[in-house]
Amino acid sequence: MGQCYGKVNQSKQNGEEEANTTTYVVSGDGNQIQPLTPVNYGRAKNTPARSSNPSPWPSPFPHGSASPLPSGVSPSPARTSTPRRFFRRPFPPPSPAKHIKASLIKRLGVKPKEGPIPEERGTEPEQSLDKSFGYGKNFGAKYELGKEVGRGHFGHTCSGRGKKGDIKDHPIAVKIISKAKMTTAIAIEDVRREVKLLKSLSGHKYLIKYYDACEDANNVYIVMELCDGGELLDRILARGGKYPEDDAKAIVVQILTVVSFCHLQGVVHRDLKPENFLFTSSREDSDLKLIDFGLSDFIRPDERLNDIVGSAYYVAPEVLHRSYSLEADIWSIGVITYILLCGSRPFWARTESGIFRTVLRTEPNYDDVPWPSCSSEGKDFVKRLLNKDYRKRMSAVQALTHPWLRDDSRVIPLDILIYKLVKAYLHATPLRRAALKALAKALTENELVYLRAQFMLLGPNKDGSVSLENFKTALMQNATDAMRESRVPEILHTMESLAYRKMYFEEFCAAAISIHQLEAVDAWEEIATAGFQHFETEGNRVITIEELARELNVGASAYGHLRDWVRSSDGKLSYLGFTKFLHGVTLRAAHARPR
């Protein structure tokens, strides 16, 4: 909503018929569905808005425009309507309409109406809606519109040029959103949010630059930077479907850098895919720009979203389960990286419901060519991003410090994950904090690289410690209006105990490690064993309650508080019990029968 969607022209070119796709966005309560018009992505190289459509399966080569491929490179047209797994062959994939309609019929017991269905909170009569956005009303005096480069259900996109001010005679792209199409309060709010996101995030090196927003009685105009280097999708196809490993690294680093910035600001993109990254120029070394925030949203650090939105080949399992957060973007980056390295989609099926089923149930293939020739670090990197357990995925910043991408000269950004983990550590039991400290002593260099970088970003005091003020200062130095809108700074209120104490690097390592993430690394068994042996001093492969008390420096009077963590039969804690205990699960709770 509040986005531009291109319309497919029913015509043929070079004997190949154009494919129609219809996008559906299901809202969080599960009983509203909005079909959008068929999509045609105009292949003009100068619009950042053509991927504003959240269509799960855009056709890589729409009709009506010249091929974006370099001279001498021919596209590989699909010969049938059956979707293919290999990314180097464009194809017209299916619409998710049938799958989502069937789900609604099952849920509601009735067939949903055809056409747009107003969302529950936006059922007001159109005449009662306030469509005044407060934007400038002098668009014609400031900008000159050029040719149309894309059209869709809510509006269209044009190239243009500035007529005055800092961007006089500067090429621009203008997204024009029709107010007549804003028939619900939700649609109006979506436009406000998209403009707010673009305005507050603009300025990052790898994010589309926002210039202005205007309106008149009929339309809203969003003025943005014009990128004429084409999409990442076009470059992939021009290279035969995949990138050499070193070239893929350069692309992935740019993607992770801009996504980590968005996540720190409390913004989840929700539609990361090759079509939503534009190159600034046709040069091979030109920068990437992230575009299309039409499906993006603000999110608090501990919030979970439940709207099913995005593109099917890139959607994370937890999105289909209607409970997701920033980790959903990481999954999408994993899919993009998989495609860059091998030229095929990790999750593929002939039908839309089959695509969702493979995302939920199957694992990507790492055995076929070219995976055997890929580096072990590259393969591990993709596996860490495409872990179906979102808790075990790396964050965007952690991915930048992975051995596959590590570069000591690269500046590592601040990670919001650090704040979440330290908050959990401060609220943990003394026994669990002691166990985390034991684990921290066994961390490998791969984990310590990330932790050192984050600790230094907090600006340690002269004595090498950090406190709540350090966490606050570091966060505010990176704050934008988006961060305030997403209420990210509120997490500092849950870390108040740090205002009265200091945290040195050794304890910071214990506080800033995730047990779930450690379980996904190859060295997990060695790390966990080292932590277990820190408590188990008698060499009998179990931890006694006396050993726990000695580690915590408590007397026999405190034994009663420790019995939840040991076996009731013999008062001991095994290695298996220790690993459960690291997750905060007591043995008594683990063995309790549900009533």
Swiss-Prot record:
Topological type in the membrane: Lipid-anchor
Residues the record lists as binding Ca(2+) 3: N540, E547
Chief place of localization: cytoplasm
GO BP: any one term: protein autophosphorylation
Source domain of life: Eukaryota
Lipid-attached positions, N-myristoyl glycine: G2
Region (Autoinhibitory domain): 409-439
Pfam families referenced in this protein's UniProt entry, alphabetically: Pkinase
GO-annotated molecular function: ATP binding; calcium ion binding; calmodulin binding; protein serine kinase activity; protein serine/threonine kinase activity
Binding residue positions for ATP: V149, G150, R151, G152, H153, F154, G155, H156, T157, K175
Regulation: Not activated by calcium. Autophosphorylation may play an important role in the regulation of the kinase activity. Stimulated by magnesium ions (optimum at 10-15 mM) and manganese ions.
Phosphoserine carried by residues: S311, S353, S574
Quaternary state and interactors: Binds calmodulin (CaM) in a calcium-dependent manner. Interacts with GLN1-1.
Protein name: CDPK-related kinase 3
Source species of the chain: Arabidopsis thaliana (Mouse-ear cress)
